[in-house]
């Protein structure tokens, strides 16, 4: 009974618990649903909050912008008000001024006249004195400036008073009122009769006749100018000091130009006849120019030098002839010919030179080094005395007649003949570095150059040339510096550069023995030995090492002595030899086997020594092999075990 009574109670309890669990599950589901709803509501509220915040922020920004606009409008209004007040004040002030002007204009005239008449007589006297003194000072300053600028000192200005001042103004106006003097001088027309020439301008025009006709024309024109009547009752303008100085400078420049034009025209027209007679033996062109790849310092301004040379020759001989005026005539000066026609009949001043001792043989020398620009100095002497004309970097020397050409240090070859009256300068062709002529050297210079050609023998301690090629000369002379080849080999043919040979080929005579000395110190092999010896030696070494592995220690030592004939017993250990060899520079390379050293510096691999009781070891090996062959395999053991389990 007890068991039957207990069983329903347990079942009831189980049912109650199941009900409670179901209720709890239902409540939890409802709560979870409620929680989800609350979460959704919370999210919605958060989103609304965010929207409200953004709108609030936008409203605040708008409010700030509106406030700023209001402030700007206030400032603008204040500025407009201030401007309006200022304009109103100005308008009122103008109105007041207009009222005052109207009142002033309608005042009676008698009051003004009375005010003007009421002046003190003493004040009038003082003002007149001051004005008079100022006028006197201004007039004096004007007179002094005119006298200083014109350069004319006239005593009548001080003595005669107003008449002298009028005459001075008249002269200045005659000189500077019209600029007709320069064109009249150039064209050769006669000057006006009232023109005065205080600066002694040359009024002569170029004349085609002799010097006497030219002088007569000049004197006749001067007489006509001086004899012309002068008008005195003209009115002249007062010229300022600045314009006066400018006119004076222009007049002086015009005077210089006219004088130069007249002189050049007279010289050209006087020498026209002699020019046609002496130009039949002329060379094709005045200057023959050959371009070179290199330019020296004195080749840069050669055109100016040629022009200056021509002007210098005119001072010595009288005339320069030039026909070729092309722009590219003076690009370089490696070889050039300058022809200067000289005339002994008349010089620039019209004087005749009839001395037979004076010839036109002229030598020219160009100095390549940079010298100071010397002024043009010309000296003309009659007789065998040499006259020189130096211009910048050039020297023109006049010497007596010589039939043979002159050579100045191999630079210039000049030849002039008196019959043709020709001045020619030939600059030698620059075929080598500097264009020196070997025939022009003196004995001392040739001795020095022979030393350069055949230098003393090289000592045995000097290293050979490290170039990849050797230079062979027909005379078997030693190597020369390349900068002197153009000077030393002007007569001989140039060097023949052979294809590259080894630097040892030049040392066949044994004069240089440093390589043998180095090989004796470092036990180097001679370079003439073949590489096959080194290969065979290395093969022998490898064979010896293989044999050492299979031999006993005693027999291996004997084999190393027998199979290495290059090894020399010098009583040193291998470590000592290694230290000596590695101490020398340049031995830690891949070509170490090329050295004539014993092979002991190569570290040999360690050989495994064979055991002394080799027979016992072989017996043990055979026993172990038999044991392994008799032992069953693992597969057989597993099969036996499975059979026993089944049983």
From Swiss-Prot:
It comes from the Eukaryota. Signal peptide: none annotated. Residues 242-253, 282-293, 375-396, 462-478, 621-647 have a biased composition (Polar residues). It is found in: Chromosome, Centromere. One of its GO terms (cellular component) is pericentric heterochromatin. Residues 28-87, 125-145 form a coiled coil. The modification Phosphothreonine is found at residue 292. Pfam families: Shugoshin_C (PF07557), Shugoshin_N (PF07558). Residues 171-295, 375-416, 453-486, 522-579, 593-647 are annotated as: Disordered. GO terms for molecular function: chromatin-protein adaptor activity. Residues 200-210 have a biased composition (Low complexity). The modification Phosphoserine is found at residues 7, 240, 332, 335. One of its GO terms (biological process) is cell division. Residues 528-541, 593-602 have a biased composition (Basic and acidic residues). Keywords: Cell cycle, Cell division, Centromere, Chromosome, Chromosome partition, Coiled coil, Meiosis, Mitosis, Phosphoprotein. Belongs to the shugoshin family. 'Shugoshin' means 'guardian spirit' in Japanese. Involved in chromosome cohesion during mitosis and meiosis by preventing premature dissociation of cohesin complex from centromeres after prophase, when most of cohesin complex dissociates from chromosomes arms. Required for faithful mitotic chromosome segregation and proper kinetochore orientation during meiosis I. In contrast to sgo1, it is dispensable for centromeric protection of rec8 during meiosis I as well as protection of rad21 during mitosis. Required to sense the lack of tension at centromeres during mitosis. This is Shugoshin-2. It comes from Schizosaccharomyces pombe (strain 972 / ATCC 24843) (Fission yeast). The lineage of its organism: Eukaryota, Fungi, Dikarya, Ascomycota, Taphrinomycotina.
């Amino acid at each position: 009974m007890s068991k039957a009574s207990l069983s329903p109670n347990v079942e009831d309890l189980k049912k109650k618990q199941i009900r409670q669990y179901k209720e709890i599950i239902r409540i939890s589901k409802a709560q979870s649903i409620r929680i989800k709803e609350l979460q959704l509501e919370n999210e919605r509220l958060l989103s609304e909050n965010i929207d409200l915040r953004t709108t609030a922020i936008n409203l605040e920004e708008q409010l700030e912008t509106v406030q700023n606009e209001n402030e700007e409008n206030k400032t603008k209004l204040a500025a407009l008000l201030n401007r309006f007040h200022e304009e109103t004040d100005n308008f009122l002030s103008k109105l007041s001024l207009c009222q005052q002007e109207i009142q002033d204009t309608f005042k009676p005239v008698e009051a003004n006249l009375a005010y003007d008449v009421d002046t003190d007589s003493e004040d009038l006297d003082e003002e007149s004195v001051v004005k008079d003194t100022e006028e006197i000072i201004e007039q004096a300053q004007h007179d002094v400036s005119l006298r200083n600028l014109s350069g004319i000192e006239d005593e009548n200005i001080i003595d005669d008073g107003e008449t002298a001042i009028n005459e001075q103004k008249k002269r200045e106006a005659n000189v500077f009122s019209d600029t007709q003097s320069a064109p009249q001088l150039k064209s050769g027309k006669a000057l006006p009769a009232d023109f005065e020439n205080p600066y002694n301008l040359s009024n002569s025009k170029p004349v085609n006749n002799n010097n006497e006709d030219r002088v007569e024309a000049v004197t006749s024109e001067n007489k006509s100018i001086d004899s012309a009547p002068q008008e005195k009752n003209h009115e002249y303008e007062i010229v300022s000091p600045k314009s006066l100085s400018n006119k004076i400078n222009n007049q002086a420049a015009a005077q210089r130009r006219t004088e130069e034009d007249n002189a050049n025209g007279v010289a050209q027209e006087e020498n026209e006849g002699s020019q046609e007679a002496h130009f039949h033996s002329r060379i094709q062109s005045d200057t023959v120019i050959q371009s070179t790849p290199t330019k020296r310092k004195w080749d840069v301004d050669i055109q100016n030098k040629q022009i200056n040379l021509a002007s210098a020759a005119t001072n010595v001989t009288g005339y320069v002839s030039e026909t070729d005026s092309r722009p590219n005539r003076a690009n370089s000066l490696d070889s050039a010919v300058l022809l200067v026609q000289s005339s002994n009949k008349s010089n620039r001043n019209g004087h005749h030179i009839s001395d037979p001792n004076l010839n036109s043989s002229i030598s020219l020398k160009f100095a390549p080094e940079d010298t100071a620009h010397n002024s043009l100095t010309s000296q003309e002497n009659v007789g065998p005395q040499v006259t020189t004309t130096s211009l910048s970097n050039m020297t023109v020397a006049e010497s007596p007649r010589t039939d043979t050409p002159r050579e100045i240090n191999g630079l210039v070859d000049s030849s002039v003949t008196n019959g043709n009256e020709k001045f020619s300068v030939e600059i030698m062709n620059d075929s080598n570095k500097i264009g020196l002529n070997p025939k022009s050297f003196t004995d001392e210079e040739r001795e020095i150059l022979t030393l350069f050609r055949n230098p003393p023998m090289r000592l045995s301690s000097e290293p050979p040339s490290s170039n990849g090629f050797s230079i062979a000369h027909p005379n078997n002379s030693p190597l020369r510096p390349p900068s002197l080849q153009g000077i030393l080999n002007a007569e001989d043919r140039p060097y023949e550069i052979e294809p590259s040979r080894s630097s040892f080929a030049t040392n066949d005579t044994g004069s240089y023995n440093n390589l043998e000395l180095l090989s004796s110190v470092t036990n180097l092999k001679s370079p003439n030995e073949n590489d096959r010896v080194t290969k065979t030696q290395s093969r022998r070494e490898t064979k010896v090492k293989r044999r050492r592995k299979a031999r006993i220690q005693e027999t291996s030592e004997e084999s190393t002595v027998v199979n290495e004939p290059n090894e020399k017993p010098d009583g040193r250990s291998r470590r000592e030899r290694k230290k000596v060899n590695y101490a020398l520079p340049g031995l830690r390379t891949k070509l170490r086997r090329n050295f004539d050293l014993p092979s002991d510096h190569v570290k040999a691999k360690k050989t495994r020594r064979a055991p002394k009781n080799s027979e016992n070891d072989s017996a043990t090996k055979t026993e172990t092999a038999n044991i392994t062959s008799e032992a069953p395999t693992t597969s057989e053991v597993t099969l036996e075990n499975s059979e026993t389990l089944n049983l």
